Amino acid sequence: MLDTNQQEFVYATYPDLKGKRVVITGGGSGIGGELTTAFAGQGARVFFLDIAEQASRELEATLSGAPIAPTFIKCDLTNLDELKAVFARIQEEAGGVDILLNNAANDDRHEIEDVTPAYWDSRMNVNLRHKFFCSQAVLPGMKERGHGVILNFGSISWHLPHTQLHLYMTAKAGIEGMTRALAREVGKYGIRANTVVPGAVVTPRQKALWHNPDEEARILAGQCIPERVEMTDVAALALFLASSNARHCSGREYFVDAGWYGA
């Protein structure tokens, strides 16, 4: 196995991200926490939303020495009134949003027979619906300014033969369609929209609930590059897509999966 993951990861620097107003949903831990760390390191003004207060407060304290200390806002994104209030607060404090990263999600496992209408609705609300309404909240300002970036975070799961993820995979498939439709409608206003599709990223949640050596060996054997995809790899792609270097990248899915899918 290659050992490049043992080297210290250093992000590329994108000067145009400095001072940008960035909102990251689910930004308190896991991939979202790394996104918060990466954008704060670029000098962006980051607001990160999460329902998990303890982990988010700890991250906020850890990053207090960033060029612009990120701001944690507790928010249940499945509550649309709460969501709208949070974006109204950000508008008042920062004057708008330049970059939106719709990352929040929950990949609970389930059996088909156990799914109720209420559970269906809850999974769509936590994995898909808020991405639309967060985008809706920032679009007026982006249109007025003539620029903006929306990155929706999908999943490799529905591209591969997984089980017990029926609703998660349904929502993640919907994200790609929603993003393409959004990109088509808002491109004329200078706004870009893309989907970031992480591969088998071992997050703290994955390690605690599902990860094991046999599963990792199986995944690595299926990848073109037989090494683990790290959270920093996902954040590095997001930085590029949010920057002006990706100014003609829109309406597409960008995989960071070490060649697990499609090769």
Give the positions of each predicted feature.
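Short C-terminal tail/terminal secondary-structure segment
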Residues: 2-13, 160, 239, 250-263
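Canonical Rossmann dinucleotide-binding motif of NAD(H)/NADP(H)-dependent dehydrogenases/reductases
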Residues: 16-47
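Active-site loop-to-helix junction immediately N-terminal to the catalytic Tyr of the SDR YXXXK motif
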Residues: 107, 115, 161-169, 181
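Substrate-binding pocket helix/loop in short-chain dehydrogenase/reductase
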Residues: 111-112, 116-124, 216-219
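C-terminal substrate-recognition "lid" of short-chain dehydrogenase/reductases
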Residues: 132, 147, 192, 228-256, ...
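Active-site helix of classical SDR
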Residues: 135, 171, 179
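Alpha-helical segment proximal to the catalytic Tyr-Lys
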Residues: 140, 184-188, 247
